[in-house]
Structure formats: C-alpha cells, structure tokens
Amino acid sequence: MTDTDPNFRFEGTFFETLGIRIVEATRERVIADMAVRPELMTIGGRLHGGALMSLADSIGAYGAFLALPQGAAGTTTIESKTNFFAGAAAGEVRGEATPLHIGGRTSVWQTRVTQKGKLVSLTTQTQMVLMPSPPRPERA
C-alpha cells in the first residue's frame, strides 16, 4: 500500500485486522469490501453479527471523519443499531455507508451490508464530533 491508497491509513488497525478494503471514500459515501473468512464466522458457517456490526461501524465512522467540520479533532460512535436480514456465507460482503445527517456536533450514518446484491444487514449509527480540548491553565 502507498499513501495514495485510501487503505494506507488503516495499516495495523482493527480495520485491517477485519480485512476491510476501501473501494470508494468521500464525505457523501464510503464503500468497502470485507472477505468472509473462517475466523469471522459462527459455528453455523455464517458471518458473525459482531463482524457485520464492526464493518458497518468502521466505514460509517470513516465517512463521519471525512465529513468533520473544520477545526474538529475527530469523531466517535455514540449510538448504533443493526437489523439483520440474512446470513452471509463464505465469500465477500460489501458495505455502503451514507449520511442521513451531517451537523456541527453529530452525524448520522446508515450502512447497508450486502452479499451478491442481497441485503444482509442495515446499521444506523450516530457519530459525535470531537472538538479539541482547550488548553489547561498552568499551575503556579
């Protein structure tokens, strides 16, 4: 990976551990693929719900990061809800995160995860905008 590859910034992170690969990333949409590997599956042979939620949270948070207002220090998830519609078998899933709201203090993102065009899960998450802490006064 190079620093022009959008996946470069995720080297050595949970994002990389999950095997998430960014396909497209703008403040209006983030698309990513994730391989459904044995270590992410349940004993029933389907992608674990926690892995689905982690994919959705990761790419929704990245979209929120890209949409941060000027001067913001970062973003963090403050609420997340996921509905599961189908199991995902071995292969690959695709997540597409889009904003429902982008404000000065929060943003709300919705992520659809599909496999071969079939809806697997739908996550809605709220991201809080983190502002830099004011400098602390020095003690005498």
Protein language model annotation of sequence segments:
Residues 1-140:
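Terminal targeting signals and extreme-terminal segments of soluble enzymes
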